[in-house]
Design a protein with these regions (language model features):
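Bacterial Sec-dependent N-terminal signal peptides
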Residues: 1-27
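Carbohydrate-active catalytic/glycan-binding domains of CAZyme proteins
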Residues: 17-337
Length: 337
């Protein structure tokens, strides 16, 4: 009887564990405010507009005290990348996991920030992952697909950016993270990335090779998480900056991707219950949106934390001169409910 009870308890524990980490595929849900996605802990949002649909790619936080990986790198256990989409910002679809760092032969794990962009009918997913021993730290990789929903496959079989290609600076072996890509008005794609140092380089038209040398963009209080965007004749380099003890969001502007970049100050404050914050902005159906994450979601008995974050969204606005108005972080977000 004791053996039977033990088996039952073990089975129940396994079911409970599976339930708490489950991400439902192809499910529809309503926007009920921030946090926006409530079926999983999500972080590092990245947006892509394809026709009438907005896609939001996220990292999947699974940093649980009683789970393998809790003592992972710096308290984070970001296991894979998830995908959500919408046509109206109110009804959303969860596509579930699209792929994981371990799908790459050169990577050992850690699904840090990424961005998907379209070029010549293909979808390129620029990502951060932990390289295996020969690469000595975080790397920027690139995957490719015929659809924004995947499946994605490794485009080149090795990292696009690895540790030996950049000056380690203050962040050592994890400075090559958080890639963002934007196409210039002449069709040149530009890659920007970095922790501690903001790196930038043009890409070749094939999206899988650098077209020129890597440059450094000097930005005040720069930490990580760059995001490139364009509106009219203005280019925007939005980035994570250091605030009063935790991260904030600042930005710079330029008339050219080649610079110079003029620092413009903060546009968002510190995230609630999270040391980190990560920006993504986009225009969708006539409105501009600012995506970020905080640590306010409670899910399956687990409270939000620095390693259990949740994606949020606010509408953002511009001044007449093209500068960005400060974005307030709210519980309502853009929900109609």
């Amino acid at each position: 009887m004791k053996k039977l009870s033990l088996l039952v308890l073990t089975a129940l524990a396994m079911v409970a564990c599976q339930k708490k980490e489950q991400v439902v595929d192809d499910s529809l849900f309503q926007n009920v405010g921030n946090p926006l996605f409530r079926n999983a802990f999500t972080a590092d949002p990245a947006t892509l507009v394809v026709g009438d649909r907005l896609y939001v790619y996220t990292g999947h936080d699974e940093c649980f005290e009683d789970s393998i990986g809790y003592e992972g790198q710096y308290g984070f256990n970001i296991t894979n990348w998830l995908l959500y989409s919408t046509e109206d910002m109110q009804t959303w679809k969860s596509h579930g996991q699209i792929f994981a760092p371990t799908d790459f032969a050169w990577a050992s794990g850690e699904a840090w920030a990424a961005q998907c962009v379209e070029k010549n009918g293909k979808y390129y997913y620029f990502l951060t992952a932990q390289g295996k021993d020969e690469y000595n730290g975080k790397c920027v990789g690139v995957a490719v697909s015929d659809s924004p929903e995947g499946p994605f496959v490794d485009a080149i079989g090795k990292p696009l950016i690895s540790d030996e290609m950049t000056d380690n600076g203050p962040r050592g072996w994890w400075n090559d993270i958080d890639p963002t890509v934007l196409e210039d008005e002449d069709g040149t794609p530009w890659l920007c990335w970095g922790n501690g140092t903001c790196f930038m380089a043009p890409l070749k038209d094939n999206m899988t090779e650098l077209a020129d040398t890597i440059s450094v963009i000097p930005l005040p209080k720069y930490v990580e998480g760059p995001w490139l965007s364009r509106r009219g004749n203005n280019y925007y380099l939005i980035y994570v900056s250091m605030g009063e003890g935790r991260e904030t969001i600042s930005y710079a502007m330029s008339k050219s991707m080649k610079g110079p970049w003029e620092p413009m100050g903060e546009i968002a404050g510190m995230a609630e219950n999270s040391f980190t914050i990560h920006p993504a902005i986009c225009e969708f159906k006539g409105h501009w949106y600012f995506f970020y994450h905080n640590g306010n979601l409670e899910l399956n008995g687990y409270k939000g934390a620095g390693g259990r974050r949740s994606v949020c969204v606010e509408e953002m606005f511009f001044n007449e001169d093209g500068t960005i108005k400060f974005v307030e972080q709210t519980e309502k977000g853009i929900s109609n409910l």
